[in-house]
Regions:
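Internal transmembrane alpha-helical bundles of multi-pass membrane proteins
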Residues: 8-12, 250-310
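Membrane-interface helix-boundary motifs at transmembrane edges
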Residues: 37-47, 225-230, 270-275
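SH3/SH3-like beta-barrel fold
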Residues: 86-91
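Aromatic-rich juxtamembrane segments at the membrane interface
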Residues: 139-266
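Flexible glycine-rich surface loops and low-complexity tracts that mediate binding to linear polymers
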Residues: 77-80, 106-125
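Beta-strand/loop nucleic-acid-binding surfaces
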Residues: 92-105
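Structural detector for short beta-strands of small beta-barrel domains
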Residues: 68-84
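N-terminal leader/targeting segments
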Residues: 1-67, 239, 254-257, 266, ...
Length: 310
């Protein structure tokens, strides 16, 4: 077990410790990580400092997201996610749930909105889906009661509008659920068919894990190798994949697959395979947690990383 992987486990453990439902897992993981770090490696000053920095950062990031800081009535930030009746807004420090049914804003738009911070509370659906827990696990602890919103810089691609235009071509909920899951890494858990697929783990395997995306990339590598070298084939496959990446640039599964693919190429051709697969996974995992610690609670994170490690 590499030291980088132990650092990765420590980061994951710290985030798990912040949630009541995963607290026990956090204890187990961090004890496992620290014991292995103590037994396998010399605990020099550098190692201790790195561990302290990682633990401090993870907990600080969590508490900044949870506590109320710099409350005002006007906020500038970016739209991280857009749904039918709400969007997720990020002001650089915290993410907010914003109820919204309009069509003037889309994902990755830079906006200024006026509103007041409030606590949110949603009823649990009959299917057992708890939207409150869903938002909290995404690092969203407050909502903004929207009074006004202005788009400062609109992103060139309207992701939500494009997705809706594609899904509108399908008549049944079953078709929309499958296409939405495969093309856009989205799934409607309120749909009976969706729940059936969820039970069978088909969606988790093909959509959340990104297995089919890796299959696409490496299949075309093999096809291009009939004509080109290995390196050129891998680059061409990535170029061919670029349109899919663009329309899913806000989806973790797609970003994770591309990041692993590109890092593997860089490690192979520029660093002469200096980093092992385990170390590459650890480095990217730590980077993802630094960007958004709450990604640890998503199925896409632990399922995709588990498959990658295996």
């Amino acid at each position: 077990m590499s030291k980088l992987f132990i650092y990765f486990l420590i980061c994951v453990s710290c985030i798990l410790l912040t949630n009541y439902d995963t607290f026990l897992y956090g204890i187990i993981f961090i004890l496992f990580a620290l014991i292995n770090l103590f037994n396998r490696y010399k605990l020099d000053k550098k190692t201790i400092i790195i561990v302290i920095i990682l633990i401090t950062f993870c907990f600080t990031k969590y508490f900044i997201s949870k506590i109320s800081l710099f409350e005002t009535n006007k906020y500038f930030g970016i739209v991280l996610d857009k749904k039918d009746n709400y969007f997720v807004f990020f002001n650089g420090l915290k993410k907010f749930y914003v109820s919204y049914k309009g069509s003037t804003i889309d994902e990755l738009d830079l906006i200024i909105l006026t509103g007041k911070q409030e606590n949110f509370h949603f009823s649990t659906l009959e299917s057992g889906f708890d939207f409150n827990k869903y938002l909290i696990n995404k690092g969203i602890f407050k909502s903004l009661n929207l009074e006004n919103v202005d788009v400062i810089v609109g992103f060139p691609i309207q992701f939500y509008s494009f997705k809706e235009s594609i899904l509108s071509k399908f008549d049944t909920l079953e078709q929309k659920a499958l296409v939405g899951g495969i093309l856009f890494s989205e799934f409607d858990y309120n749909n009976d068919f969706a729940n059936q697929v969820k039970i069978l783990n088909l969606f988790s395997l093909f959509s959340v894990s990104g297995v089919y995306l890796n299959f696409f990339l490496y299949t075309f590598v093999k096809l291009f190798e009939l004509k080109f070298t290995k390196k050129v084939s891998e680059i061409l496959s990535l170029i061919l994949f670029t349109p899919f990446l663009i329309i899913n640039i806000t989806r973790f599964t797609t970003i994770r697959v591309v990041a692993f693919y590109v890092f593997r190429m860089i490690n192979k051709y520029n660093f002469n395979n200096y980093f092992s697969k385990n170390e590459r996974i650890s480095i990217l995992g730590i980077l993802f947690i630094i960007i958004d610690p709450f990604i640890v609670f998503s199925t896409a994170f632990y399922l995709s990383f588990l498959i990658s490690i295996i």
